């Protein structure tokens, strides 16, 4: 771009009433600090139309997950989980919102006395020395088919939920089917009575509706690049009714594969599975209060597994290893991999770590310090991001990148803090991607942290240096990428007081085109639209014309969400089948119950076992 695409995105601004952009009063910051708080009680109602007109043919249901920080420095997307379902019809839009009550979240909400209470470690995770780690299960809602839905989380096992009630039903896999992610020496020190083991997995397990197979991973054993000889990645396969199958991934050199950072995304094609190490680092020293930054390395390690090598009589599988020359987090693949060629798309994360929080009293690059109010919100990137396409060639015993097919597009106005994608058939990859929509969260100069800028000062391929970073804020943007041309064909920049993090594609009735439908976006703004409501809003766009602005804006005084993560659209919902899978975890809790204090036993007996036992 370059800049002409950005200007095209603004061309539609004149069609939108200026009230959407108006600020009633002048303040130093246009950032909506209310993104850090939300209600902890259930709510429901019919959304009010604040602006525009809801399309007459919009339909279906959107599920949106969120995180609510519980204290200062708590990374907000990883906060206490909540989920909202939006029901669209010709009569309007209704919503229902509930907390995501995993067993560990229920326990944390009831226990606050030493030694059982949970303590925040490094802003990232809550830990109890007598019980283990909290799993908020709030990364992404997923569809399994047959009215079965699941929530996933990188720091704990996934759970199925009932779409009609929003209540969790069962973990996927018995807790004993998941391996502890702690290093062996730490694992040896954990008490047998632990209720909530530390499990690391991907934020995006893949539920293949064509083959009726589910794939995910379980990894750990190392801490960053320390203790990698004990590291492991287990590829898990599930038929949605039986126990999990698992294979330890081994490289061509005979050494176990490991992940030093995180594994936010999993790639699945017709014949292959791709495990990505993604750009979100959990620094070991952070857990003891040291705020040092381990910068991303401008690389994405990938392990490529052939599905045909997953033998039922073996517990290992060989993978080929490759490093891609960029940092990314959300990755999608064409399901079609004919001639063993794999095409993937993702963000280009320029000099940033999506899991890096702002901490209380952090020094800001442009002067001042982080306020207590915002401590825990993700730090701003220190360079503009982008969008990438990469292609891989898999042979019988190796894999290589088709370097000549690599594409990177960047835009110095639009591509700041590249975040979630949206596409038709969300979390179900099409044979070939034609259109992907992206959220760019934006750039706020008052969120640029000095220690982060220093850590990334020598990061490769920077367009902006620390000395040339913008001195004014750049707002959130909704971006339409044409995958065949690898270009931005349409875009919309939000008013400066808005934060948009979560887009979701909603198909039009009886349509098949990947751009034939609407875009749902969750927006938090400092100055509510037309001065109505609480600033927690839903904006609806025409997928073929983002630049014209929102078709409709909706809100409700009781719709009060915090930092949203991923969303899911489905055309219809129904009750979960009564005879569907359930993991029998009741005995797991009952055998440990006598080893705990009375208050903990009460929570197990009165709140956990009635739901999960």
Segments the model singles out, each with a brief description of its role:
Residues 6-14, 21-613:
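Beta-propeller domains
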């Amino acid at each position: 771009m370059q800049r002409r695409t950005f200007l095209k995105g603004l061309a539609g601004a004149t069609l939108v009433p200026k009230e959407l952009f108006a600020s009633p009063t002048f303040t130093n910051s246009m950032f909506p600090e209310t993104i850090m708080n939300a209600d902890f009680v259930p709510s429901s109602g019919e959304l009010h139309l604040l602006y525009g007109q809801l399309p007459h043919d919009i339909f279906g249901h959107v599920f949106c997950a969120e995180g609510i920080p519980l204290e200062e420095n708590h990374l907000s997307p990883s906060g206490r989980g909540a989920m909202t379902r939006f029901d669209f019809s010709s009569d309007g839009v209704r919503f229902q919102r509930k907390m995501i009550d995993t067993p560990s979240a229920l326990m944390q909400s009831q226990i606050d006395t030493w030694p059982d209470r949970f303590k925040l470690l490094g802003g990232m995770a809550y830990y109890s020395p007598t019980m283990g780690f909290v799993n908020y299960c709030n990364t992404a809602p997923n569809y399994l088919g047959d009215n079965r839905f699941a929530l996933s989380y990188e720091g704990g096992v996934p759970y199925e939920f009932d779409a009609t009630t929003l209540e969790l039903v069962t973990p996927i896999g018995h807790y004993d089917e998941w391996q502890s992610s702690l290093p062996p020496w730490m694992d040896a020190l954990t008490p047998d009575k632990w209720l909530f083991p530390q499990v690391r997995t991907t934020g995006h397990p893949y539920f293949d509706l064509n083959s009726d197979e589910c794939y995910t991973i379980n990894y750990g054993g190392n801490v960053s690049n320390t203790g990698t000889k004990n590291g492991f990645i287990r590829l898990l396969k599930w038929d949605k009714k039986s126990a999990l199958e698992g294979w330890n991934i081994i490289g061509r050199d005979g050494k176990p594969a490991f992940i030093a950072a995180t594994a936010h995304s999993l790639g699945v094609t017709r014949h292959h599975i791709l495990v990505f190490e993604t750009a979100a680092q959990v620094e070991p020293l952070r857990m003891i209060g040291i705020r040092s930054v381990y910068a991303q390395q401008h690389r994405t390690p990938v392990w490529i597994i052939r599905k045909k090598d997953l033998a039922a009589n073996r517990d290992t599988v060989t993978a080929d290893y490759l490093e891609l020359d960029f940092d990314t987090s959300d990755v999608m693949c064409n399901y079609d991999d004919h001639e063993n060629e794999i095409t993937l798309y993702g963000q280009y994360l320029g000099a940033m770590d999506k899991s890096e929080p702002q901490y209380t009293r952090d020094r800001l690059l442009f002067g001042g310090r982080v306020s207590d109010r915002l401590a825990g919100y993700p730090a701003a990137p220190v360079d503009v991001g982008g969008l990438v396409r990469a292609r891989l060639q898999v042979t019988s015993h190796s894999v290589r990148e088709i370097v000549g097919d690599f594409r990177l597009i960047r835009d110095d106005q639009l591509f700041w803090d590249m975040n979630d994608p949206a596409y038709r058939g969300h979390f179900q990859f099409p044979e070939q991607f034609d259109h992907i929509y992206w959220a760019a969260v934006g750039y706020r100069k008052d969120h640029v942290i000095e220690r982060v800028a220093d850590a990334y000062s020598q990061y490769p391929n920077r367009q902006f240096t620390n000395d040339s970073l913008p001195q004014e804020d750049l707002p959130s943007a909704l971006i339409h990428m044409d995958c065949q041309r690898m270009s931005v064909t349409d875009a919309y920049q939000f008013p400066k007081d808005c934060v948009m993090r979560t887009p979701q594609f909603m198909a039009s009735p009886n349509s098949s085109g990947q751009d034939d439908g609407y875009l749902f976006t969750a927006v938090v703004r400092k100055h509510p639209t037309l001065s109505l409501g609480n600033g927690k809003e839903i904006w609806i766009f025409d997928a073929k014309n983002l630049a014209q602005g929102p078709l409709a804006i909706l809100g409700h005084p009781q719709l009060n969400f915090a930092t949203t993560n991923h969303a899911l659209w489905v055309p219809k919902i129904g009750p979960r089948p009564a005879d569907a899978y359930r993991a029998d975890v009741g005995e797991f809790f009952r055998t440990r119950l006598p080893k705990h204090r009375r208050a903990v036993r009460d929570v197990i007996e009165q709140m956990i076992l009635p739901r999960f036992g």
